[in-house]
Amino acid sequence: MSDSPATAHTRLELPIDIIKIQALLPHRYPFLLVDRILELDQKQKRIVAQKNVSINEPFFQGHFPEHPVMPGVLIIEALAQAGGVMTQLDLSHNGHSSLLFYMVRVDNARFNKQVVPGDILILDMTMKRRIRNMGCYYGEARVNGEVVACADIMCAGVRS
């Protein structure tokens, strides 16, 4: 196991695969939008995740059949899910937290470029603060190093 800054606090081997992600998030197909965790630094409250965008995504059937584009709201949801993985790891005992997090607010959302089939979406989330059961994050989604979307996201945790 590596002792890099990304794993020293969590003692998790990176990358974190879909099996571990499914143990941390309640989302399932077709709404699980995080495929892999590439970086995790719980001391800095930062996570970097990956979403492989495939033409087989069900939303491409209607958005748009002749010009498939990933809906911006799903990019924001993917960012929130990445933040959810980080928060669950931070709060969990034996890999599971008793809180279920819901997105309750999105501010300053910007969409700079379309995300299309074949893109690898890199989701970079930083927790700005946590107040009791609320988490405030800033996230950027990138394709080929270029920011395609960003937003401030607030999530609230409730007992599951």
UniProtKB/Swiss-Prot annotation:
Entry's Gene Ontology BP terms: fatty acid biosynthetic process; lipid A biosynthetic process
EC class of the enzyme, as a word: lyase
A GO MF label: (3R)-hydroxyacyl-[acyl-carrier-protein] dehydratase activity
Record-linked InterPro entries: FabA_FabZ, FabZ, HotDog_dom_sf
EC number(s) given by UniProt: 4.2.1.59
Cleavable signal peptide: none
Subcellular location: Cytoplasm
Disulfide feature: none
Family to which this protein belongs: Belongs to the thioester dehydratase family. FabZ subfamily.
Family matches, as HAMAP family: FabZ
Protein purpose: Involved in unsaturated fatty acids biosynthesis. Catalyzes the dehydration of short chain beta-hydroxyacyl-ACPs and long chain saturated and unsaturated beta-hydroxyacyl-ACPs.
UniProt name for this protein: 3-hydroxyacyl-[acyl-carrier-protein] dehydratase FabZ
